[in-house]
């Protein structure tokens, strides 16, 4: 799985959120290997706590820059880790992230 720009996305997320990041997970068609040229790159960002306006703006700006740079749509969904853990076996979306997702980065 070679997704141009994915490492840059992960590095950018870590630079913005630092110790708040619990896990970064690739999910969707790229994780399943069913992607096409029209597929977006779906990434779940599991954080300890919520976004503030400043970090949300930085994330949005970085993602837009990567979308333009690589002519690919990176779609980043931010999820509070406590909420994710509570509902991971119930909510279909969270189950999908757990079952099909590929962990790109995980806190030690």
Give the role of each language-model region.
Residues 1-22, 32-37, 48-108:
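Catalytic core of pol beta-like nucleotidyltransferases
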Residues 42-46:
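Short beta-strand->loop micro-motif that forms the acidic, two-metal-ion catalytic signature
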């Amino acid at each position: 799985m070679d997704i141009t720009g994915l490492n840059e996305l992960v590095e950018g997320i870590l630079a913005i959120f630092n110790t708040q990041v619990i896990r970064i997970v690739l999910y969707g068609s790229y994780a399943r290997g069913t992607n096409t040229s029209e597929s977006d790159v779906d990434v779940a960002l599991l954080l300890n706590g919520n976004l503030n306006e400043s970090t949300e703006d930085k994330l949005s700006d970085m993602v837009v820059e990567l979308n333009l740079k690589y002519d690919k749509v990176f779609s980043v969904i931010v999820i509070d880790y406590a909420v994710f853990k509570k509902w991971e076996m119930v909510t279909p979306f969270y189950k999908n992230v757990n079952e099909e997702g590929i962990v790109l980065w995980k806190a030690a």
